[in-house]
Amino acid sequence: MKALDYKLLLALDAVMQEQNFERAAQRLHITQSAISQRIKQLEQQFAEPLLIRSQPLQATPLGQKLLAHYRQVRQLELELAGEIAPDEPQAPIRVSIAVNADSLATWFLPALAPLLEQHPIELNLLVDDECRTLDRVREGQAFGAVSLHGQPLAGCCVDELGEMRYLLTASPAFVARHFPAGLTPAALAKTPAVAFDQRDDMHVSFMARHFGLEPGGYPCHTVRSSEAFVAMAEQGLAYCLIPELQIRQQLAQGILLDLSPSHHLIEPLYWHRWVLERGLHKQISQRLISEGRRALQPG
Protein backbone atom coordinates (compact mmCIF):
# COMPACT_ATOMS: atom_id res chain seq x y z
CA MET A 1 0.00 0.00 0.00
CA LYS A 2 1.23 3.49 -0.83
CA ALA A 3 1.98 5.84 2.05
CA LEU A 4 -1.07 7.74 3.25
CA ASP A 5 -1.33 11.33 2.09
CA TYR A 6 -2.66 13.20 5.11
CA LYS A 7 -3.64 16.16 2.96
CA LEU A 8 -6.17 13.89 1.27
CA LEU A 9 -7.34 12.47 4.60
CA LEU A 10 -7.81 16.02 5.87
CA ALA A 11 -10.16 16.65 2.94
CA LEU A 12 -12.16 13.51 3.73
CA ASP A 13 -12.42 14.51 7.38
CA ALA A 14 -13.52 18.05 6.50
CA VAL A 15 -16.26 16.78 4.18
CA MET A 16 -17.59 14.44 6.86
CA GLN A 17 -17.40 17.09 9.57
CA GLU A 18 -19.15 19.74 7.47
CA GLN A 19 -21.49 17.33 5.65
CA ASN A 20 -21.03 19.50 2.58
CA PHE A 21 -18.30 19.82 -0.08
CA GLU A 22 -18.62 23.59 -0.38
CA ARG A 23 -18.35 24.24 3.37
CA ALA A 24 -15.46 21.77 3.61
CA ALA A 25 -13.64 23.69 0.88
CA GLN A 26 -14.21 26.98 2.73
CA ARG A 27 -12.91 25.43 5.93
CA LEU A 28 -9.67 24.37 4.20
CA HIS A 29 -9.43 27.60 2.14
CA ILE A 30 -9.43 25.75 -1.18
CA THR A 31 -11.90 25.50 -4.05
CA GLN A 32 -14.77 23.02 -4.10
CA SER A 33 -13.30 21.35 -7.18
CA ALA A 34 -9.99 20.93 -5.33
CA ILE A 35 -11.62 19.16 -2.42
CA SER A 36 -13.60 16.93 -4.79
CA GLN A 37 -10.34 16.08 -6.56
CA ARG A 38 -8.66 15.14 -3.28
CA ILE A 39 -11.50 12.79 -2.39
CA LYS A 40 -11.29 11.29 -5.87
CA GLN A 41 -7.51 10.78 -5.52
CA LEU A 42 -8.00 9.01 -2.21
CA GLU A 43 -10.69 6.75 -3.66
CA GLN A 44 -8.49 5.96 -6.65
CA GLN A 45 -5.61 5.07 -4.34
CA PHE A 46 -7.74 2.45 -2.57
CA ALA A 47 -9.75 1.51 -5.67
CA GLU A 48 -13.09 1.79 -3.89
CA PRO A 49 -15.52 4.48 -2.71
CA LEU A 50 -14.90 6.12 0.65
CA LEU A 51 -18.04 8.26 0.75
CA ILE A 52 -21.70 7.40 0.29
CA ARG A 53 -23.19 10.45 -1.42
CA SER A 54 -26.43 10.48 0.56
CA GLN A 55 -28.12 12.88 2.95
CA PRO A 56 -26.46 12.91 5.38
CA LEU A 57 -23.11 11.98 3.84
CA GLN A 58 -21.80 8.67 5.16
CA ALA A 59 -18.39 7.03 5.12
CA THR A 60 -18.03 3.52 3.72
CA PRO A 61 -16.46 0.89 6.01
CA LEU A 62 -13.02 1.68 4.56
CA GLY A 63 -13.73 5.40 4.84
CA GLN A 64 -14.59 4.90 8.52
CA LYS A 65 -11.26 3.15 9.13
CA LEU A 66 -9.32 5.91 7.41
CA LEU A 67 -11.18 8.60 9.35
CA ALA A 68 -10.59 6.82 12.66
CA HIS A 69 -6.87 6.55 11.86
CA TYR A 70 -6.59 10.19 10.79
CA ARG A 71 -8.41 11.48 13.86
CA GLN A 72 -6.26 9.40 16.20
CA VAL A 73 -3.09 10.73 14.57
CA ARG A 74 -4.42 14.29 14.72
CA GLN A 75 -5.23 14.01 18.41
CA LEU A 76 -1.79 12.58 19.16
CA GLU A 77 -0.17 15.45 17.24
CA LEU A 78 -2.12 18.07 19.20
CA GLU A 79 -1.22 16.55 22.54
CA LEU A 80 2.42 16.12 21.53
CA ALA A 81 2.59 19.80 20.56
CA GLY A 82 1.37 20.73 24.03
CA GLU A 83 4.00 18.52 25.65
CA ILE A 84 6.85 19.85 23.50
CA ALA A 85 5.97 23.52 24.00
CA PRO A 86 3.86 23.71 27.17
CA ASP A 87 4.38 27.46 27.57
CA GLU A 88 2.99 28.34 24.16
CA PRO A 89 -0.74 29.12 23.84
CA GLN A 90 -2.54 25.96 22.81
CA ALA A 91 -5.75 25.76 20.84
CA PRO A 92 -8.55 23.89 22.64
CA ILE A 93 -8.39 20.15 22.08
CA ARG A 94 -11.65 18.83 20.64
CA VAL A 95 -12.62 15.59 22.36
CA SER A 96 -15.46 13.52 20.88
CA ILE A 97 -17.09 10.98 23.17
CA ALA A 98 -20.18 8.84 22.59
CA VAL A 99 -22.27 8.49 25.73
CA ASN A 100 -25.71 7.22 26.63
CA ALA A 101 -28.25 9.73 27.91
CA ASP A 102 -28.63 8.15 31.35
CA SER A 103 -24.89 8.32 32.07
CA LEU A 104 -24.81 11.91 30.83
CA ALA A 105 -27.66 12.81 33.20
CA THR A 106 -25.99 11.23 36.24
CA TRP A 107 -22.27 10.51 36.73
CA PHE A 108 -20.57 11.43 33.44
CA LEU A 109 -20.20 15.24 33.62
CA PRO A 110 -19.12 15.31 37.29
CA ALA A 111 -16.39 12.85 36.33
CA LEU A 112 -14.99 15.21 33.69
CA ALA A 113 -15.57 18.51 35.52
CA PRO A 114 -12.05 18.78 37.04
CA LEU A 115 -10.39 18.25 33.64
CA LEU A 116 -12.69 20.77 31.96
CA GLU A 117 -11.71 23.34 34.57
CA GLN A 118 -7.97 22.68 34.23
CA HIS A 119 -7.47 22.17 30.48
CA PRO A 120 -8.60 23.83 27.22
CA ILE A 121 -11.05 21.16 26.08
CA GLU A 122 -13.91 21.37 23.61
CA LEU A 123 -16.26 18.49 24.38
CA ASN A 124 -18.24 17.02 21.51
CA LEU A 125 -20.70 14.64 23.15
CA LEU A 126 -22.50 12.25 20.80
CA VAL A 127 -25.56 11.12 22.76
CA ASP A 128 -27.14 7.84 21.75
CA ASP A 129 -28.59 4.65 23.14
CA GLU A 130 -26.03 2.56 25.03
CA CYS A 131 -26.55 -0.20 22.46
CA ARG A 132 -25.33 2.10 19.66
CA THR A 133 -22.67 4.38 21.17
CA LEU A 134 -19.88 1.99 20.19
CA ASP A 135 -20.80 2.49 16.53
CA ARG A 136 -19.49 6.07 16.83
CA VAL A 137 -16.01 4.75 17.72
CA ARG A 138 -16.18 2.16 14.94
CA GLU A 139 -17.07 4.91 12.45
CA GLY A 140 -14.25 7.18 13.63
CA GLN A 141 -16.59 9.82 15.06
CA ALA A 142 -15.46 9.43 18.69
CA PHE A 143 -12.30 8.41 20.49
CA GLY A 144 -14.25 6.67 23.24
CA ALA A 145 -17.72 5.45 24.19
CA VAL A 146 -19.76 4.40 27.18
CA SER A 147 -21.46 1.22 26.01
CA LEU A 148 -23.23 -1.86 27.30
CA HIS A 149 -21.10 -4.03 25.02
CA GLY A 150 -18.04 -5.55 26.66
CA GLN A 151 -16.19 -6.80 23.57
CA PRO A 152 -13.50 -4.33 22.38
CA LEU A 153 -13.20 -3.20 18.77
CA ALA A 154 -9.98 -3.74 16.84
CA GLY A 155 -7.49 -1.08 17.90
CA CYS A 156 -9.43 -0.30 21.07
CA CYS A 157 -9.36 -1.37 24.70
CA VAL A 158 -12.19 -1.63 27.22
CA ASP A 159 -12.71 -1.40 30.98
CA GLU A 160 -15.79 -2.36 32.97
CA LEU A 161 -17.36 0.60 34.76
CA GLY A 162 -20.13 -1.08 36.71
CA GLU A 163 -23.86 -1.66 36.51
CA MET A 164 -26.72 0.81 36.22
CA ARG A 165 -29.88 -0.27 38.03
CA TYR A 166 -33.24 0.79 36.58
CA LEU A 167 -36.52 0.97 38.48
CA LEU A 168 -40.03 1.05 37.03
CA THR A 169 -41.35 4.29 38.51
CA ALA A 170 -44.31 6.68 38.59
CA SER A 171 -45.81 9.33 40.86
CA PRO A 172 -48.22 8.35 43.67
CA ALA A 173 -51.07 10.20 41.92
CA PHE A 174 -50.38 8.36 38.66
CA VAL A 175 -50.38 5.01 40.47
CA ALA A 176 -53.67 5.80 42.21
CA ARG A 177 -55.27 6.84 38.92
CA HIS A 178 -54.02 4.06 36.64
CA PHE A 179 -53.08 1.14 38.89
CA PRO A 180 -55.65 1.00 41.72
CA ALA A 181 -55.57 -2.81 41.54
CA GLY A 182 -51.82 -3.07 40.87
CA LEU A 183 -49.83 -3.63 37.67
CA THR A 184 -52.37 -5.84 35.95
CA PRO A 185 -52.05 -6.62 32.22
CA ALA A 186 -55.37 -4.87 31.60
CA ALA A 187 -54.21 -1.68 33.33
CA LEU A 188 -50.78 -1.70 31.67
CA ALA A 189 -52.36 -2.17 28.23
CA LYS A 190 -53.99 1.26 28.40
CA THR A 191 -51.50 3.23 30.53
CA PRO A 192 -48.85 5.45 28.87
CA ALA A 193 -45.19 4.54 29.24
CA VAL A 194 -42.02 6.23 27.91
CA ALA A 195 -39.18 4.96 25.67
CA PHE A 196 -36.06 6.79 24.50
CA ASP A 197 -36.88 6.33 20.81
CA GLN A 198 -38.41 3.84 18.40
CA ARG A 199 -35.26 1.70 18.48
CA ASP A 200 -35.06 1.59 22.28
CA ASP A 201 -35.99 -1.93 23.34
CA MET A 202 -35.22 -1.52 27.05
CA HIS A 203 -38.81 -0.84 28.11
CA VAL A 204 -40.24 -3.23 25.52
CA SER A 205 -38.11 -6.18 26.64
CA PHE A 206 -38.70 -5.41 30.33
CA MET A 207 -42.48 -5.36 29.94
CA ALA A 208 -42.48 -8.49 27.79
CA ARG A 209 -40.26 -10.40 30.22
CA HIS A 210 -42.02 -9.49 33.45
CA PHE A 211 -45.61 -8.71 32.42
CA GLY A 212 -46.11 -10.59 29.14
CA LEU A 213 -46.89 -7.44 27.14
CA GLU A 214 -45.98 -7.43 23.46
CA PRO A 215 -44.55 -4.41 21.59
CA GLY A 216 -47.36 -2.13 20.49
CA GLY A 217 -49.69 -3.58 23.10
CA TYR A 218 -49.75 -0.38 25.17
CA PRO A 219 -49.35 3.39 24.59
CA CYS A 220 -45.76 4.60 24.73
CA HIS A 221 -44.28 8.09 24.37
CA THR A 222 -40.84 8.50 22.77
CA VAL A 223 -38.64 11.13 24.42
CA ARG A 224 -34.92 11.44 23.68
CA SER A 225 -34.06 12.98 27.05
CA SER A 226 -33.22 11.26 30.30
CA GLU A 227 -34.20 14.36 32.28
CA ALA A 228 -37.59 14.43 30.53
CA PHE A 229 -38.24 10.85 31.69
CA VAL A 230 -37.96 12.06 35.27
CA ALA A 231 -40.10 15.14 34.60
CA MET A 232 -42.87 13.09 32.98
CA ALA A 233 -42.90 10.63 35.86
CA GLU A 234 -42.92 13.40 38.49
CA GLN A 235 -45.75 15.25 36.73
CA GLY A 236 -47.90 12.13 36.54
CA LEU A 237 -47.81 11.88 32.75
CA ALA A 238 -46.39 8.37 32.38
CA TYR A 239 -44.55 5.53 34.08
CA CYS A 240 -41.04 4.57 32.96
CA LEU A 241 -37.72 2.89 33.68
CA ILE A 242 -35.32 5.37 35.31
CA PRO A 243 -31.85 4.79 36.78
CA GLU A 244 -32.04 4.52 40.56
CA LEU A 245 -28.94 6.73 40.67
CA GLN A 246 -30.95 9.55 39.08
CA ILE A 247 -33.97 9.53 41.41
CA ARG A 248 -32.71 8.56 44.86
CA GLN A 249 -33.95 11.83 46.35
CA GLN A 250 -37.40 11.53 44.73
CA LEU A 251 -37.75 7.96 46.01
CA ALA A 252 -36.69 8.95 49.53
CA GLN A 253 -39.19 11.83 49.56
CA GLY A 254 -42.04 9.78 48.11
CA ILE A 255 -42.25 11.91 44.96
CA LEU A 256 -41.77 8.74 42.90
CA LEU A 257 -42.60 5.13 43.70
CA ASP A 258 -40.92 1.87 42.73
CA LEU A 259 -43.81 0.12 40.97
CA SER A 260 -42.28 -3.33 40.90
CA PRO A 261 -39.76 -3.85 43.74
CA SER A 262 -39.18 -7.47 42.75
CA HIS A 263 -38.36 -6.60 39.13
CA HIS A 264 -35.41 -4.36 38.31
CA LEU A 265 -33.33 -3.97 35.18
CA ILE A 266 -29.54 -4.18 35.46
CA GLU A 267 -27.36 -2.91 32.59
CA PRO A 268 -23.56 -3.27 32.60
CA LEU A 269 -21.59 -0.32 31.27
CA TYR A 270 -18.09 -0.30 29.76
CA TRP A 271 -15.65 2.40 28.70
CA HIS A 272 -14.16 1.82 25.23
CA ARG A 273 -11.37 3.96 23.78
CA TRP A 274 -8.49 3.90 21.34
CA VAL A 275 -5.46 1.89 22.38
CA LEU A 276 -3.23 4.77 21.24
CA GLU A 277 -4.19 7.22 23.96
CA ARG A 278 -1.86 9.55 25.81
CA GLY A 279 -1.86 12.85 27.63
CA LEU A 280 -5.26 14.42 28.03
CA HIS A 281 -7.15 11.53 26.45
CA LYS A 282 -5.54 9.16 28.93
CA GLN A 283 -6.53 11.45 31.80
CA ILE A 284 -10.10 11.47 30.51
CA SER A 285 -10.17 7.68 30.48
CA GLN A 286 -8.75 7.50 33.99
CA ARG A 287 -11.38 9.92 35.31
CA LEU A 288 -14.28 8.14 33.61
CA ILE A 289 -13.14 4.73 34.85
CA SER A 290 -12.56 5.82 38.45
CA GLU A 291 -15.71 7.95 38.76
CA GLY A 292 -17.87 5.50 36.84
CA ARG A 293 -16.85 2.73 39.22
CA ARG A 294 -17.53 4.99 42.20
CA ALA A 295 -21.02 5.98 41.03
CA LEU A 296 -22.23 2.69 39.55
CA GLN A 297 -22.84 -0.60 41.29
CA PRO A 298 -20.03 -3.19 41.05
CA GLY A 299 -20.52 -5.72 38.27
Swiss-Prot record:
Residues 21-40 bind DNA. SUPFAM superfamilies: Periplasmic binding protein-like II (SSF53850), Winged helix' DNA-binding domain (SSF46785). GO terms for molecular function: DNA binding; DNA-binding transcription factor activity. It holds the Pfam family LysR_substrate. InterPro entries: ArgP, ArgP_gammaproteobact, LTTR, LysR_subst-bd, Tscrpt_reg_HTH_LysR, WH-like_DNA-bd_sf, WH_DNA-bd_sf. Homodimer. Belongs to the LysR transcriptional regulatory family. Controls the transcription of genes involved in arginine and lysine metabolism. This is HTH-type transcriptional regulator ArgP. It comes from Aeromonas salmonicida.
